[in-house]
Amino acid sequence: MAQPGKILKEQKYDRQLRLWGDHGQEALESAHVCLINATATGTEILKNLVLPGIGSFTIIDGNLVSGEDAGNNFFLQKSSIGKNRAQAAMEFLQELNSDVSGSFVEESPENLLDNDPSFFCRFTIVVATQLLESTLLRLADVLWNSQIPLLICRTYGLVGYMRIIIKEHPVIESHPDNALEDLRLDKPFPELREHLQSYDLDHMEKKDHSHTPWIVIIAKYLAQWYNETNGRIPKSYKEKEDFRDLIRQGILKNENGAPEDEENFEEAIKNVNTALNTTQIPSSIEDIFNDDRCINITKQTPTFWILARALKEFVAKEGQGNLPVRGTIPDMIADSNKYIKLQNVYREKAKKDAAAVGNHVAKLLQSVGQAPESISEKELKLLCSNSAFLRVVRCRSLAEEYGLDTVNKDEIISSMDNPDNEIVLYLMLRAVDRFHKQHGRYPGVSNYQVEEDIGKLKSCLTGFLQEYGLSVMVKDDYVHEFCRYGAAEPHTIAAFLGGAAAQEVIKIITKQFVIFNNTYIYSGMSQTSATFQL
């Protein structure tokens, strides 16, 4: 019998459990997130992590709540003015979910980096908002060397900016959109071939004929097609139309010679493209197999790469060039008995393949002196059912992005083919940071400074472009606009960015879905966004 607490939790988190499952929720509840600066953007991010039940969070902020903070931050009130910003925000955020533990550190990140940089290495992930460039570079370096993920978030006027910094992020459950079914009709495994041979469409009662699964129907007519075309699978549009006609001819006729209403045959005709999907290993999986980390297994090799290597060995041996069978089939018109039998054929093959991969895993673990049980059966099943969708994301460090010799000029210059591309906003953010470094403030923070700062900001932009050897032109309109922003943090933009950033944090923690690589820019002016590898 299920425990009452567990039932309540399932009810509370029902919708998200459908997205990332029990194991994803467990990862979320075990995570400790660090937020640097309780700004409007920062508290919006935490709000979207506290509500789904993040384990715990710590806010680092040495600032006191100002009137401006209370005006643009939903989690700070007039009564908060004068209090430490981290403490005030933490108290309000904790009210959202009693399952979540919150804490705060009343100190600036600069002081912590000076006195105790290892402090940041205790967290699952660090989220930094509205930090100065110099502080970001120091923080990013500490976390990069400790392999702690860092998400930089910034709201600047009508611009939203995010940067993910993570050395390597492997994903087993990438949840691709419109994933193709794994039916293997072009390369039927022996158990499937034997099951298909048990059907004889030409000598069936009408009831059985109209309740035969469409997978069986397509397989039967595919065998007939092979006989007529020397084993060539239908590929072109015309060939697939001819194949559909061949299936259509198999629909039973009534006593008047008119076709019967057989929905399963119509379903088969609609699913020709799905069924004739070629069984092959995606190039992205081949890249993983050829990666040095997959080839060279040691005692320190992470679980993902041991699983990937076992998968590679399965493909070379038992799989005969193919990945493990996924073991699922779509819903279809069929009687329960026929559907379940067909479903079991795929399920049993999937179990058999998973067991074979498991044997390779055990041998690999033993070869590097690790216990065979150190990788669970659950992890093994997840790998096999998602073997076609594995992903590895590797981001560049912030030091590489900012380095004169390592800056990704090609990405910036090619994006500037369109003078209004979102990459312009990135260039402007770099320019305002240079402005701050030179003048100790951001451009246009006071109304009387807007006009006089236009020339100064343009000079900073020109200097930045020249220093990095970027032969691109930025419209003056953008310089004027960024001066008018005055480094403001509008709550509408902060709220949007908070939702987007929390989504990426959850992806990193649960290791499900695919994070962007590595920079995301949102334009509130044009309501568009783009990602770049910088």
UniProtKB/Swiss-Prot annotation:
According to the UniProt entry, its GO molecular function terms are: NEDD8 activating enzyme activity; protein heterodimerization activity; ubiquitin protein ligase binding
- Subcellular location(s) of the protein: Cell membrane
| One Pfam family from the record | ThiF
Post-translational note: Ubiquitinated by TRIP12, leading to its degradation by the proteasome.
Q: Hey, which pathway is this one from?
A: Protein modification; protein neddylation
Q: What is its main location?
A: membrane
Q: Which residues carry this modification: N-acetylalanine?
A: A2
Q: Where is this region: Interaction with UBA3?
A: 331-344
In the UniProt record, does the keyword Cell cycle occur? Answer: yes
One GO term of the cellular component aspect? plasma membrane
Q: How is its activity regulated?
A: Binding of TP53BP2 to the regulatory subunit NAE1 decreases neddylation activity.
Note the site residues: Interaction with UBA3: H211
Q: Which domain of life is it from?
A: Eukaryota
Give the keywords, sorted.
Acetylation, Apoptosis, Cell cycle, Cell membrane, Membrane, Ubl conjugation, Ubl conjugation pathway
**N6-acetyllysine PTM sites in chain numbering:** K6, K341
Q: Which processes are annotated in GO (biological process)?
A: mitotic DNA replication checkpoint signaling; neuron apoptotic process; protein neddylation; regulation of neuron apoptotic process; regulation of postsynapse assembly
Q: Which PANTHER family match?
A: NEDD8-ACTIVATING ENZYME E1 REGULATORY SUBUNIT (PTHR10953:SF29), UBIQUITIN-ACTIVATING ENZYME E1 (PTHR10953)
What is the purpose of this protein?
Answer: Regulatory subunit of the dimeric UBA3-NAE1 E1 enzyme. E1 activates NEDD8 by first adenylating its C-terminal glycine residue with ATP, thereafter linking this residue to the side chain of the catalytic cysteine, yielding a NEDD8-UBA3 thioester and free AMP. E1 finally transfers NEDD8 to the catalytic cysteine of UBE2M. Necessary for cell cycle progression through the S-M checkpoint. Overexpression of NAE1 causes apoptosis through deregulation of NEDD8 conjugation.
Report the family membership: Belongs to the ubiquitin-activating E1 family. ULA1 subfamily.
The subunit structure is:
Heterodimer of UBA3 and NAE1. The complex binds NEDD8 and UBE2M. Binds APP and TP53BP2.
Q: What is this protein called?
A: NEDD8-activating enzyme E1 regulatory subunit
Q: Which organism is it from?
A: Mus musculus (Mouse)
